[in-house]
C-alpha cells in the first residue's frame, strides 16, 4: 500500500515537473504572456507540494528498520528517481528566474525570441494542475513581483535537497535499475515503428533499385567508350 502511494506521488511529481519544463521553454518567446507567468507560478508550487509529500513518505519508509531488503531496494530506487526530479525542478526554476529577468513583459523595447512555437500553454498547465480549465487571478505585474518569490523558492528546494541527503544516504551508483536505459520509451515508439519501418523499407528498396539502374547505365557507357577507343587504336595502327 505504501509502495503504491509512493509510486503515485512520484508519478504525479514527474508529470508536473515535465509540464513545468515545457512552459519554462516558452518564456521570452512569442507565446509568453501574463497568463504564462501565472501558470508557471502555480505549476512550480504544485511541484513543490508534491515534492514535500514525496520526501515525507520516502524518508519515513527508508528510515524504518522493519522494511524488508527487497522493499528497501525498491524504495531506494524510487528515492533516486525522486532526487532526480527535484534536481530537474531546481534547474528549471533557475532557468525561469534568469529568463524572467531577461524578458520582463512590460518593457516594450524588449524583443521576444522567435522560437517558431505558437499557441498557448493553458492546456499544459491544466494537466499539471489536474483541472479542467485554468483560472487566472494574478496582478498585471506578476512578471516582476513573482521573481522574488521564485528566488526564495529556489533556495527552499536547495535546502530540501540538502536535508534529504543528511537524513537518508542513498548513493545513486549503488541503486540498480530495473530496466535498460530508454526501455520505458520502447513501448510507445514500437506502436508507430512498424508503419514507419514499412515506409522506410519501401523507400530503401526504391532507392536501391534506382542506384542499380544508374550503376548499369554508367557501366555500359564506360564499356562502349572502351570498345570505341580500342577500334580507333586498331585502325590507327
Swiss-Prot record:
Q: Which domain of life is it from?
A: Eukaryota
Tissue expression, as annotated, is:
Expressed in a variety of neuronal tissues, particularly in sensory cells including inner ear hair cells, photoreceptors and dorsal root ganglion neurons.
- According to the UniProt entry, the coiled-coil residues are 29-58, 135-169
A single Gene Ontology CC annotation of this entry is:
neuron projection
- What keywords are annotated for this sequence in UniProt? Coiled coil, Membrane, Signal transduction inhibitor, Transmembrane, Transmembrane helix
Compartment list:
Membrane
Return one Gene Ontology term, BP aspect. detection of light stimulus involved in visual perception
Q: Which residues lie on this side of the membrane: Cytoplasmic?
A: 1-212
Residues exposed to the Extracellular side: 234-237
Signal peptide residues on this chain, from the entry's feature table = none
- How does it sit in the bilayer? Single-pass type IV membrane protein
Q: In terms of one coarse class, where is the protein primarily found?
A: membrane
Q: What InterPro entries has UniProt attached to this entry?
A: RGS7BP/RGS9BP (IPR026512)
Name the residues that span the membrane: 213-233
What this chain does, per the entry, is described as: Regulator of G protein-coupled receptor (GPCR) signaling. Probably acts by regulating the activity of some 'R7' family protein (RGS6, RGS7, RGS9 and/or RGS11).
> Which family does the record assign?
Belongs to the RGS7BP/RGS9BP family.
Matching entries from PANTHER family are given as: R-SEVEN BINDING PROTEIN (R7BP) HOMOLOG
Query: Can you say what this protein is called?
Result: Regulator of G-protein signaling 9-binding protein
Species name: Gallus gallus (Chicken)
Amino acid at each position: 500500500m505504501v509502495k503504491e502511494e509512493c509510486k503515485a506521488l512520484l508519478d504525479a511529481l514527474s508529470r508536473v515537473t515535465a509540464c513545468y519544463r515545457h512552459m519554462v521553454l516558452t518564456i521570452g518567446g512569442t507565446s509568453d504572456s501574463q497568463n504564462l507567468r501565472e501558470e508557471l507560478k502555480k505549476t512550480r508550487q504544485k511541484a513543490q507540494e508534491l515534492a514535500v509529500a514525496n520526501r515525507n513518505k520516502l524518508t519515513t519508509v527508508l528510515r524504518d528498520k522493519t522494511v524488508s531488503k527487497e522493499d528497501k531496494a525498491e524504495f531506494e530506487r524510487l528515492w533516486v528517481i525522486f532526487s532526480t526530479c527535484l534536481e530537474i525542478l531546481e534547474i528549471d526554476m533557475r532557468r525561469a528566474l534568469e529568463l524572467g529577468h531577461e524578458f520582463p513583459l512590460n518593457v516594450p523595447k524588449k524583443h521576444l525570441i522567435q522560437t517558431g512555437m505558437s499557441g498557448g500553454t493553458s492546456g499544459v498547465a491544466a494537466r499539471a494542475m489536474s483541472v479542467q480549465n485554468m483560472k487566472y487571478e494574478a496582478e498585471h505585474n506578476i512578471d516582476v513581483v513573482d521573481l522574488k518569490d521564485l528566488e526564495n523558492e529556489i533556495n527552499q528546494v536547495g535546502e530540501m535537497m540538502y536535508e534529504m541527503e543528511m537524513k537518508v544516504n542513498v548513493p545513486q551508483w549503488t541503486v540498480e535499475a530495473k530496466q535498460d536505459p530508454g526501455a520505458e520509451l520502447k513501448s510507445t515508439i514500437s506502436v508507430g515503428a512498424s508503419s514507419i519501418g514499412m515506409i522506410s523499407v519501401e523507400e530503401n528498396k526504391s532507392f536501391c533499385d534506382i542506384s542499380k539502374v544508374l550503376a548499369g547505365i554508367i557501366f555500359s557507357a564506360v564499356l562502349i567508350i572502351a570498345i570505341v577507343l580500342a577500334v580507333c587504336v586498331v585502325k590507327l595502327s
